[in-house]
A protein has these predicted regions:
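N-terminal Rossmann-like or analogous alpha/beta NTP/dinucleotide-binding catalytic cores
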Residues: 41-97, 102, 107-111
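Active-site-proximal binding-pocket segments
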Residues: 229-401
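Beta-rich, aromatic/charged-enriched effector core domains that present basic-aromatic interfaces
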Residues: 81-203, 377-380, 398
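Single conserved hydrophobic/aromatic residue that forms the stacking wall/gate
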Residues: 400-409
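Residue-level signal for inorganic ion chemistry
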Residues: 27, 98, 240
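N-terminal beta-strand-loop-alpha-helix module at the start
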Residues: 1-71
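Glycine/tryptophan-enriched, flexible segments
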Residues: 143-294, 401-402
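Short alpha-helical segments and helix-capping/turn motifs at coil-helix boundaries
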Residues: 17-24, 84-85, 111-115, 254, ...
Length: 409
């Protein structure tokens, strides 16, 4: 069925929330609006993407669908890539306007999105909103920080005000509930992974700013204490179940009255760094495959699949490294310092090319954020040409390890 009247189409990707969502807020401000998430099967099997990340995405979409239902809207799933979606929109909604938030992702998605944006931008039908303060055009390092701060201090948008009763139900799209039923997913055996959803993100932020952040600036480096002392918001930030602006403003609000000022300041700095690294990948997308310093690509050219498999499985024979890998596989998360150690071990001790180990490690992270992961992989592999190489000692004795074991490790 072809809709000749104007329709606003909101395209979701890494902004799976109802509050402070510019694309959703402005896109739903019309008599007729359609909210779509594009499920591209190939995307979820591409460079570093994995089933555990998709499960978090599904959790988040499910909660968002429930919130939209209360506003008399449904979340629809388009099955296909962005090229196919563009053709579908042109065929069925030739007068539509498209609303989406800016996001930086892996090469596979970036190329498809660039073509999608170009197609609709040229006709003045596309509206893309800033989310992380990433400059997509005319990148200027001199005003980057001031621009980031401007975005983080803007007014937080409420949920969209949808007062219209008219609903669009395209026959060739599945609503979220039907899509999830079609997937026939078996409940994951591992219930140790974090669950997605905006409500869970807000609860984590509240508990972190309340008591959990006590000692954060020190405890975040500990493989024992970090699990409970870190914010644990990383997957929620990556999938956009809470806006970075919301987090930033809550931190600012607590700054004067909190007794954890040092910890708050340390956390606030990391919000800035988060976007700094994503900007790096946005500006230099080739970093996904090539070393920052071109001469370093010839350092480690041949990979040893057997070594890489033992590393991923936590079967290297180095107790501390193996314990960290088993923990990561079980939880889908480990603290930043241990991530650095794991990657450094693969690049220095095993002398494996980061291009082979990077996606394998990324698959284990529920919170995989390409911009951060890829930049950190290169830093820990010593291929940036500007960062001091760090080699971590993993020769921890069994006696020392046993003293700090969790119940499982």
């Amino acid at each position: 069925l072809k809709y000749s009247s104007p329709v606003n189409i909101v395209l979701l990707h890494k902004n799976l929330r109802i509050s402070d969502n510019s694309a959703l807020y402005h896109g739903c401000n019309a008599d007729k609006s359609l909210i779509i998430y594009a499920y591209d099967k190939d995307y979820w099997s591409n460079n570093g993407k994995s089933e555990r990340q998709f499960q978090f995405c599904l959790d988040s979409l499910g909660e968002l669908d429930e919130k939209l239902n209360k506003l008399n809207r449904d979340l629809f799933i388009f099955e296909g890539d962005l090229d196919e979606l563009a053709l579908w929109i042109d065929k069925n909604f030739p007068q539509s306007k498209i609303f989406l938030n800016q996001s930086t992702d892996i090469h596979y998605h970036r190329n498809l999105k660039a073509k999608f944006i170009s197609k609709f931008e040229d006709s003045g039908r596309l509206y893309e909103f800033e989310d992380f303060g990433i400059q997509t055009k005319n990148h200027n390092r001199d005003d980057w920080s001031s621009n980031w701060h401007r975005i983080m201090t803007q007014k937080i948008l409420p949920p969209p005000q949808i007062n219209h009763s008219s609903k669009i139900k395209p026959k060739d799209l599945l609503d979220f509930k039907a899509f999830k039923k079609k997937l026939s997913l078996v409940d994951p055996k591992n219930n140790s992974f974090q669950l997605g959803g905006e409500d869970k993100a807000k609860k984590l932020l509240s508990s972190f700013l309340g008591k959990r952040m006590d000692g954060y600036s020190i405890k975040m480096s500990s493989p024992v204490e970090a699990e409970h002392s870190c914010s644990r918001l990383s997957p929620h930030i990556s999938f956009g179940t809470i806006s970075l602006r919301t987090i930033f403003q809550e931190v600012q609000k607590n700054m004067d009255s909190s007794i954890f000022k040092k910890d708050l300041y340390s956390f606030k700095k990391r919000l800035h760094w988060h976007c700094h690294f994503i900007q790096k990948l946005e500006t230099e997308p080739e970093l996904e495959f090539k070393s920052m310093h071109p001469m370093c690509d010839s350092l480690r050219e041949e990979g040893n699949d057997e070594l890489i498999e033992k590393w991923i499985a936590g079967e290297t024979g180095f107790p501390f490294l193996d314990a960290c890998m088993v923990f990561l596989k079980e939880k889908g998360w480990i603290n930043f310092r241990m991530r650095a150690m794991i990657m450094s071990f693969a690049s220095y001790n095993l002398w494996q090319p980061w291009q082979k180990t990077s996606p394998r490690l990324a698959e284990l992270f529920v919170d995989y954020e390409p911009g951060i992961h890829i930049c950190q992989v290169q830093m820990q592999s010593g291929v940036t040409g500007i960062n001091l190489p760090r080699i971590y000692s993993v020769s921890v004795s069994y006696t020392h390890l046993r003293a700090h074991e969790t119940d499982r490790h």
